[in-house]
């Protein structure tokens, strides 16, 4: 991968009072809650809203009355929360200033703000490209308790710390037993975790009563970092489990972090260093909830040229694995897709990852490295995967950005083909909306570090539906940024503000 606490509560909002009164342990999911990165542990990036049809997409417009002010740079995806029985909802936005903002989802006014400590100045790190460094990985919400979990890079006495917080959505207060200092607790178990060299860009996830946090390095691959997954028991936050790569490097740094299905976690690792034998890099790894190491070929995959990928910094870790099912002659086929910086797509059997060289299908699908997070949706029993990159099967010769959609068909040897391509200037992570789970799919993407606009395309043929030309150019969009959808709005997080689009 080269590439003390303060709380400010804004009073006087009746809508905020209604909202926080309804947050309780009996909370249950509203239809448009967005609790984690890409709207679920599978990281599909799919949202279902009957009202967002192809026709309605043409009339999407910027909500210029939406305030949406936050402090600091924004790399993490916003989340959306409506408590059980509440008539209003909130956006949760975490920033590199180590602040968490709860905003009213309609007006954008502040409900509460929580500061989690001093972010890390770049001068305290050996390398990296985020300054200051605070909250980068997308948090996750536990709907059963009304709690948001996140990892914050905190500087204390000029020493970097990774601290995992649990905050009440009622008022942003820290729950008892939190935060957890990752390096300190692991050290108690005689494990070495170098908080200065470990970066936390990937999204957190919740599975079976545990919080899982992925770690990689910083841009520049400096210091003694490894790919880590740390599990924290929600009932006993002082109880940690962990898995790490055997070789140095192998970071888990994609914005989607950890994908999950059932009781299984899936991660993609980056390039390792000085590994003469395969040591967990350039891989898709399945982990059980206790994070024990498995040497079973069914629980890992790496390309046969893993060592060459190491040497070229062409790792699989730039995108998170995505899980999906397709139709085949023998019924539904459980698959997983990995996309590499080498421009290749690897289709794996989700129940048997196959070990080294064990993919079901592999194809060159991009002329340039594939980064960020893909989105996946289904049509007619086949899977479609959208990513921002210069597609190998695309006719255009765009060099400043392209949206590529692959079609994956089932079978003993699944086929990978290019469904359609469209030019989009930028580098972000797309999402997909449908009206019922499959009908009228729309691929949405923002021109992060490009044209700064929102774009929407028909998912079946790539026809442009919305190009954002009548709306604002969104300033402060960082690469890998994605957006979220609710039943009547789209939201995009950017430096010091959130943009809202109504439909």
Where are these regions (language model features)?
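Boundary at the C-terminal end of the N-terminal hydrophobic targeting segment
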Residues: 25-29
């Amino acid at each position: 991968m080269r590439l003390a606490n303060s709380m400010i509560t804004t009073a006087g909002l009746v809508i905020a009072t209604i909202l926080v009164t309804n947050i309780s342990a009996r909370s249950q999911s509203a239809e448009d809650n967005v609790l984690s990165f890409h709207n679920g542990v599978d990281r599909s990036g799919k949202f279902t809203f009957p009202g967002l049809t192809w026709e309605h997409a043409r009339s999407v417009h910027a909500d210029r009355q939406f305030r949406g002010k936050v402090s600091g740079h924004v790399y993490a995806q916003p989340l959306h929360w409506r408590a059980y029985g509440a008539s209003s909802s909130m956006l949760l936005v975490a920033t590199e200033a180590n602040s968490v903002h709860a905003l009213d989802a309609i007006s954008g006014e502040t409900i509460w703000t929580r500061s989690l400590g001093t972010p890390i100045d770049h001068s305290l790190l050996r390398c990296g490209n985020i300054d200051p460094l605070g909250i980068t990985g997308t948090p996750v919400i536990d709907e059963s308790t009304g709690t948001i979990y996140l990892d914050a890079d905190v500087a204390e006495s000029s020493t970097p710390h990774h601290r995992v917080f649990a905050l009440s959505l009622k008022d942003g207060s820290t729950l008892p037993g939190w935060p957890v200092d990752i390096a300190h607790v692991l050290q108690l178990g005689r494990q070495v975790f170098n908080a200065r060299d470990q970066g936390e860009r990937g999204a957190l996830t919740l599975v079976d009563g545990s919080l899982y946090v992925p770690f990689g390095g910083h841009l520049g691959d400096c210091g003694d970092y490894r790919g880590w997954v740390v599990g924290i028991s929600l009932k006993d936050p002082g109880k940690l489990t962990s898995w790490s790569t055997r070789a140095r490097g192998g970071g888990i740094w994609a914005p989607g972090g950890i994908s999950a299905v059932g009781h299984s976690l899936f991660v993609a690792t980056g390039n390792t260093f000085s590994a003469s034998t395969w040591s967990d890099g350039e891989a898709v790894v399945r982990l059980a909830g206790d994070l024990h190491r498995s040497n079973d070929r069914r629980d890992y995959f790496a390309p046969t040229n893993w060592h060459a990928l190491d040497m070229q910094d062409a790792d699989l870790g730039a995108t998170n694995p995505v899980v999906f099912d397709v139709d085949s002659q023998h019924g539904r086929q459980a698959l997983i897709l990995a996309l590499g910086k080498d421009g290749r797509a690897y289709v794996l059997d989700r129940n048997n990852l196959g070990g080294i060289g064990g993919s079901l299908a592999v194809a060159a699908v991009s002329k340039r490295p594939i980064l960020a997070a893909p989105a996946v949706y289904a049509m007619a029993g086949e899977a479609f995967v959208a990513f921002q990159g210069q597609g190998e099967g695309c006719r255009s010769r765009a060099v400043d950005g392209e949206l590529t959609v692959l079609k994956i068909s089932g079978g003993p040897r699944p086929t990978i083909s290019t469904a359609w391509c469209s030019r989009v200037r930028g580098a972000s992570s797309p999402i997909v909306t449908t009206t019922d789970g499959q009908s009228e799919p729309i691929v949405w993407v923002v021109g992060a570090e490009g044209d700064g606009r929102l774009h929407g395309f028909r998912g079946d043929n790539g026809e442009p539906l919305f190009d954002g030309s009548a709306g604002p150019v969104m300033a402060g969009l960082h690469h890998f940024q994605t957006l979220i959808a609710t039943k009547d709005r789209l939201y995009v997080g950017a430096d010091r503000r959130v943009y809202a689009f109504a439909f």
